[in-house]
C-alpha cells in the first residue's frame, strides 16, 4: 500500500513537471533536476522557511519545519476569509462595493464603487483568482468593516485551534496594527485548511476550474479560472491556495486525498522572485513522504482494569471489617474497536488505564471513576470513561443501625 501510493504521487508530479509550462507559463516550469524518487526519509532541504504536513483526519502534525514560527502568509489568508463568509452569510446575499474595496491593489477583479454582486459569485473570485478587491467587499459585507471582519477571522482561528494567528486583512496583504503583524504559522495554516475541507461548499468552490458571473444588473460579466495548478496535475487534490507578498514570499496550502488518506501541506516563505516553482517541489516532497510512510492502523487495545479498593465501604453485615473492592466498566462499541489512525512504521499507540487505586465510599453504580486513554507521542488521541460496575455503601452508625433493624424485623 505504501509503495503504490508513493509511485502514484511521484508519477503525478513527474507529469506535472512535463506539462505545467503550458498551464500557467513561467510559474509552473519546475526544474528538471527535482529528485523524483519516493520520499522515504523525512524531507530535507525544503525551500520553505516554515512547513507542515498534517493528517487531515486527526489533525496530527506528521512533519514540520519550524512549524510554530509566526510568519506572513499572504493570500492563503483567503481560505479562512472564505470559510467565515460561508458560515456567516447566505450565498444569495447582495454585496455592495465600497470605494475601499474598489481601490484595492492588484491582483483584483476590477470592482467599481456602487456595484452589487451575489456573495457566492465573489467567493469564486476570491478563491479561484485571489482577487484582493473581492476580499474587501466580502469582509465589509460580513463584518461591516474590515476591522470587524478581522475580529471574526481571529475568533474563528482560535475556535479551530490555532495557537499563533493574527489576521488583520481579509486578503492577506501585509499589514500591522496594535496586535502586531499579519501572520500565522505553518501548523495553524494547516489546521485552517483541515477545517475548511469539511465544508462541502468550500470544496466545490475550490475544485471548480472555471466560473462565470455578472454583477447583479448584468451590465458586466466576468470569467475566472482556477489558479491552483495542482488541480490539473494530480488526482485527489481537494483544495489549494497560493499567495505572495514581498514580506511573505511565496506561500501555499493544499489538501490532498489518496486511498482514503488525507494530507494537508502548508508552506510559508517558500522562495521569493524568481523562485515561484519552489512551492511545487516542496509540496511533492511532503506529500510523497506522507503517502509512502503512513498507513491507517487500528489502535484499540483491551484495557486492564485492576480492582479498586473502596475505603469505608461495606456490602453486608457478614463482611463488616473486610476490605471492599470493585471493578470499573468501560463500554465500547464495535466501531470503537475499529478506529484507525495514520501511523508510520515503528510508531505505536500506548493504552493507559487512568483510574485511582482506591476511592472513598459511597460509590454509585455508573459513577465515573477514570478513563482508558490512548496516547501517541505523548499526546492524548482518544479516551473512554470508566464507570463503577456496582454501588458500594459507606459504613456508618446510621447504616449499621438500619441494617440491624431491617434484619431483626424481617
Give the label of every model feature segment:
Residues 2-22:
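Sec-dependent N-terminal signal peptides of Gram-positive bacterial secreted proteins and lipoproteins
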Residues 180-410:
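Domain-terminus/edge residues, biased toward the C-terminal soluble/receptor-binding domains
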Residues 21-200:
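Active-site-adjacent loops and short helices of periplasmic peptidoglycan-processing enzymes
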Residues 2, 78, 390-391:
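An N-terminal domain-start capping segment
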Amino acid at each position: 500500500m505504501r509503495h503504490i501510493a508513493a509511485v502514484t504521487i511521484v508519477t503525478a508530479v513527474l507529469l506535472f513537471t512535463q506539462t505545467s509550462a503550458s498551464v500557467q507559463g513561467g510559474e509552473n516550469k519546475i526544474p528538471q533536476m527535482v529528485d523524483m524518487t519516493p520520499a522515504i526519509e523525512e524531507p530535507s532541504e525544503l525551500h520553505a522557511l516554515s512547513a507542515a504536513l498534517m493528517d487531515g483526519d486527526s489533525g496530527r502534525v506528521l512533519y514540520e519545519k519550524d512549524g510554530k514560527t509566526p510568519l506572513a502568509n499572504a493570500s492563503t489568508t483567503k481560505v479562512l476569509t472564505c470559510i467565515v463568509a460561508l458560515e456567516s452569510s447566505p450565498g444569495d446575499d447582495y454585496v455592495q462595493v465600497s470605494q475601499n474595496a474598489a481601490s484595492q491593489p492588484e491582483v483584483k477583479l476590477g470592482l467599481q464603487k456602487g456595484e452589487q454582486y451575489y456573495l457566492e459569485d465573489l467567493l469564486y473570485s476570491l478563491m479561484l483568482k485571489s482577487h484582493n478587491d473581492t476580499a474587501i467587499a466580502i469582509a465589509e459585507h460580513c463584518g461591516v468593516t474590515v476591522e470587524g471582519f478581522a475580529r471574526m477571522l481571529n475568533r474563528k482561528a482560535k475556535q479551530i485551534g490555532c495557537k499563533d494567528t493574527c489576521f488583520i486583512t481579509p486578503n492577506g496583504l501585509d499589514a500591522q496594527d496594535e496586535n502586531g503583524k499579519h501572520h500565522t504559522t505553518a501548523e495553524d495554516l494547516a489546521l485552517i485548511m483541515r477545517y475548511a475541507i469539511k465544508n462541502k461548499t468550500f470544496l466545490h468552490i475550490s475544485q471548480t476550474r472555471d466560473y462565470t458571473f455578472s454583477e447583479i444588473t448584468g451590465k458586466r460579466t466576468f470569467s475566472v479560472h482556477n489558479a491552483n495548478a495542482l488541480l490539473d496535475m494530480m488526482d485527489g487534490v481537494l483544495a489549494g491556495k497560493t499567495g505572495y507578498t514581498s514580506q511573505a514570499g511565496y506561500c501555499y496550502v493544499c489538501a490532498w486525498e489518496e486511498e482514503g488518506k488525507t494530507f494537508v501541506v502548508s508552506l510559508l516563505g517558500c522562495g521569493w522572485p524568481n523562485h515561484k516553482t519552489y512551492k511545487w517541489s516542496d509540496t511533492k516532497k511532503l506529500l510523497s513522504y506522507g503517502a509512502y510512510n503512513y498507513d491507517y492502523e487500528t489502535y484499540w487495545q483491551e484495557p486492564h482494569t485492576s480492582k479498586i479498593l473502596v475505603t469505608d465501604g461495606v456490602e453486608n453485615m457478614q463482611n463488616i471489617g473486610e476490605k471492599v473492592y470493585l471493578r470499573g466498566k468501560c463500554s465500547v462499541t464495535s466501531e470503537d474497536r475499529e478506529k484507525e489512525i495514520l501511523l508510520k512504521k515503528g510508531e505505536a499507540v500506548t493504552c493507559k488505564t487512568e483510574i485511582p487505586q482506591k476511592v472513598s465510599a459511597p460509590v454509585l453504580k455508573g459513577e465515573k471513576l477514570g478513563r482508558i486513554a490512548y496516547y501517541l507521542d505523548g499526546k492524548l488521541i482518544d479516551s473512554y470513561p470508566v464507570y463503577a460496575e456496582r454501588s458500594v455503601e459507606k459504613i456508618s452508625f446510621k447504616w449499621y443501625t438500619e441494617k440491624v433493624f431491617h434484619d431483626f424485623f424481617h
